[in-house]
Curated annotation (Swiss-Prot):
InterPro entries: UPF0756_TM. It holds the Pfam family DUF441. It is found in: Cell membrane. The chain crosses the membrane at residues 16-36, 53-73, 82-102, 114-134. It is a multi-pass membrane protein. This is UPF0756 membrane protein SG1722. The keyword Cell membrane applies. GO terms for cellular component: plasma membrane. Keywords: Cell membrane, Membrane, Transmembrane, Transmembrane helix. PANTHER family: UPF0756 MEMBRANE PROTEIN YEAL (PTHR38452:SF1).
Amino acid sequence: MNFSDPTLLILLGLAALGIISHNNIVTVAILVLLIIRLTPMEQYFPWVEKQGLTIGIIILTIGVMAPIASGTLSASTVLHSFLHWKSLLAIVIGVAVSWLGGRGVSLMSSQPSVVAGLLVGTVLGVALFRGVPVGPLIAAGLLSLLVGNT
């Protein structure tokens, strides 16, 4: 490992932030990237860069939809969500957050320079404010509202 490689130093720094903030998701993700970077698997980075976000969103969607698919969240519960004002508000907020996430994906794809800032901000939010590490896509969506998507 070449410790004078700035990319490795950045990844190690982000991994350290993940460890310090007890953000296992960030820590594991960075460590996987380090393993890829330091092994012959490095040749797969173009594929990871092109498909990684899409695969991650697919896995996230599977996790969100699993309670419906397994029957834990019944069809009647889903249908009743259209009858209560809190559930209707949750639907509206879910639509808004999904829209923001979509803007975030576009921004992160078109302006990769913001990804590190979003990641550091998310890790700091977890470490300093007891936040939850679910924010980079939504944060990117909010950022896109402020700075534009190009």
